[in-house]
Amino acid sequence: MNNIEQAISFARQEYTRQGLDALYQKDFEEALLPALSQAAEIYRADTLRWSGDPKTDLLAALLWSQKLLNDYQRHQLPDEVFYHTIDDIGRWASEYWSYSGKIGLAESAWLTNHLTLRLFQLGRLQFCMEPADFSAPSFGLEPGEPLVSVHICRGGSLDPAACDASFARARAFFPKHFPAYAFRFFSCHSWLLDETLLPLVGVYSNISFFQQRFQIVGRTASNAAARYVLRWDIQPDEIAAFIPQNRFQSQLKTQLLSQQQFYEATGILAR
């Protein structure tokens, strides 16, 4: 079996392991034709490139997972971290399916971090090595300083104990596996750090406890809360007709219809 055949075989296995066969009710070949005709070209490329076609990009993510596994093995990174990290492919494929009814990926650029050995899922949270794109003068932090950014993938609550365990793993993981990557801070840029949410979720909620981990150093107006809580592709003129499925959605819808502004906030946490 040559390298391309191995990559296609691995992609097929991941397609099934991540539940895409059940989601689409189609096997690997049926779901990804005609994109499969480009498999060799995608796999042989020196760098990961996204085509902009959702189906082709899903195939690219699955094929490059096999290259990523080779990188993990060279760096002696745990298999468990590899599989948890690339599970995000299935999450984003499911997200795209939920609002479009189509096979593919719409947020493929985000997965570049996973597939190029920069982002790792360590328990509940994801951690990504990247330079700061903001400043925090009171902390002596300038743009370009190496950080480890924190991301919260869909699936599961923000249980404080689970988050504690993730941070503990990250504090051990990066010095062990990437000792040359010196960083002083974790950072997080998220709608979940928006204090405007507190009247909706309460001060004793998991979201509130997560916010309290960070020193907030900035915020920008954003519709991210509507996208993550209501529907990923929702437009402002569609909010009134949206049917809430839970209390949080109902409360957020009410606030959005009253013209409440929500934000994405940036916070930092000392390593």
Describe every region a protein language model picked out.
Residues 1-158, 176-185, 199-271:
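Non-catalytic substrate-recognition and accessory regions of acyl/acetyltransferase enzymes
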Residues 195-197:
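Solvent-exposed beta-hairpin/edge-strand motifs
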Residues 158-175, 186:
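Conserved acetyl-CoA-binding loop-helix of GNAT-fold acetyltransferases
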Residues 188-193:
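An acidic- and aromatic-residue-enriched active-site/binding cleft used to recognize and process polar
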